[in-house]
Curated annotation (Swiss-Prot):
Organism: Polaromonas sp. (strain JS666 / ATCC BAA-500)
SUPFAM superfamilies hit by this protein: CbiD-like
An individual GO BP term: anaerobic cobalamin biosynthetic process
PANTHER family referenced in this protein's UniProt entry, alphabetically: COBALT-PRECORRIN-5B C(1)-METHYLTRANSFERASE
Keywords (A to Z) from UniProt: Cobalamin biosynthesis, Methyltransferase, S-adenosyl-L-methionine, Transferase
Gene name, Swiss-Prot/TrEMBL: cbiD
Entry-linked Gene3D superfamilies: CbiD-like
Enzymatic reactions: Co-precorrin-5B + S-adenosyl-L-methionine = Co-precorrin-6A + S-adenosyl-L-homocysteine
Protein name: Cobalt-precorrin-5B C(1)-methyltransferase
A Pfam family hit: CbiD
């Protein structure tokens, strides 16, 4: 069980995959014994054994397997710990039924509230449920651990559903990834760490993978909502899945673009994040590295800013200050163009001959001020 007395903000939780595996294991125990337990010990992908509370357990039908039933139902409520996870308190539900026609097999299906994959690029079958590979294996492992006696004679069909999933998915990136109708069943370890960036990083990589299957050969990477809206207006010919909000995770987005064999990468951003990319940062979070104002002063000088302005830019702490000073001199477009060119120069050094690059720059109101390619 999770530690209830952990310091605030540090309490870990469990993934949708771990909770699904626990619910499935409990339901199979119900088929074996005739009664679904109130708690079940579940093996996580990371090797830990964890006890989950089980609700709404029931065994239905007669004339079934060892325990007499033909189907069983169990539900585990997800506890995300202190992580602000939109799937916290989701009801991960497993319905398991006997399949006399498929002895020894474990089949996995998605029910209501589990998304359906509609686009390639995710490593999942198009038309199938959005249950990722690690949770799939973990669910099957837990089913086999307690149901081997049944599996000697019959197969087991496990359907995972999430009653609130259709509503919860509106707060995720699933629609952009072509996962429709519900949430994804996720988790590589089974554990959710508070405020971890792992899930977002994974969604960035998946987004780029999907963009690589669209046939356009291009992905448009943005640093946030405003920049994405801006580049969508600049490139209306591209479908929505070609645009990926990479946030601070340039490294992962670019790595995925290389693996996907994309021919062109477009980056949309504002002066702050673009400066960090230009100076060689591949993770642009505010806490990872300071803005190189010396670089900004150099760029300002290259487009004609007087020495006193360059000194002021160098002595300030923000990229926004540099942009505003250059705008006031009437050199804003030239300055931001020089910055975009430096971004391309830096990325070409890191990713030589990998793809065509283009950078679009917008101001803090989302208006275009420069571009380079």
């Amino acid at each position: 069980m999770m530690k209830k007395d952990a310091p605030r903000g540090t309490r870990t939780g469990f993934t949708t995959g771990a909770c699904s595996a626990a619910a499935a294991r409990a339901a199979v125990i119900g088929l074996v014994t005739g009664q679904v337990p109130d708690a079940v010990e579940c093996l996580l992908p990371n090797g830990d054994l964890v006890t989950f509370a089980v609700q709404d357990g029931r065994v239905e039908g007669v004339g079934g397997g060892v325990g007499g039933g033909v189907s069983a139902h169990a539900m585990v409520i997800k506890d995300a710990g202190d992580d602000p996870d939109c799937t916290d308190k989701a009801h991960l539900t497993a319905d398991v039924r006997l399949r006399h026609d498929l002895p020894g097999q474990v089949l996995l299906a998605g029910g209501f509230g589990v998304g359906t994959v509609t686009m390639p690029g995710l490593g999942l079958a198009v038309g199938g449920p959005a249950i990722n590979p690690v949770p799939r294996r973990n669910i099957e492992a837990n089913v086999r651990a307690v149901g081997q006696g049944l599996l000697d004679e019959v197969g087991l069909e496990v359907t995972i559903s999430v009653p609130q999933g259709e509503e919860m998915t509106k707060k995720t990136l699933n629609a952009r990834l072509g996962i429709l109708g519900g949430i994804s069943i996720l988790g590589t370890t089974g554990i959710v760490k508070p405020y971890s960036t792992a899930a977002y990083r994974a969604s960035v990589v998946q987004g780029v993978q999907v963009a690589g299957t669209l046939g356009h050969g291009v992905v448009v990477l943005t640093t946030g909502g405003r920049t994405e809206k801006f580049v969508m207006e600049e490139m209306p010919e591209l479908p929505e899945p070609a645009f990926v909000q990479m946030g601070d995770f340039l490294r992962y987005a670019m790595g995925a673009a290389v693996k996907a064999g994309l021919k062109k990468v477009v980056i949309g951003g504002m002066v702050g994040k673009l400066t960090k990319i230009a100076q060689g940062e591949t993770i642009t979070h505010a806490g990872r590295a300071e803005v190189d104002t010396g670089l900004l002063a150099e760029l300002a000088a290259s487009v004609g800013a007087p020495p006193d302005v360059c000194d002021a830019i160098r002595g300030n702490e923000t990229a926004r200050y540099a942009g505003e000073r250059m705008d006031a001199l009437g050199l804003g477009q030239a300055f931001h163009t020089a910055l975009a060119q430096r971004v391309i120069q830096t990325l070409r050094t890191r990713y030589p001959d990998q793809f065509e690059l283009k950078v679009l720059v917008c101001d803090f109101d989302g208006r275009k001020i420069a571009e380079a390619s």
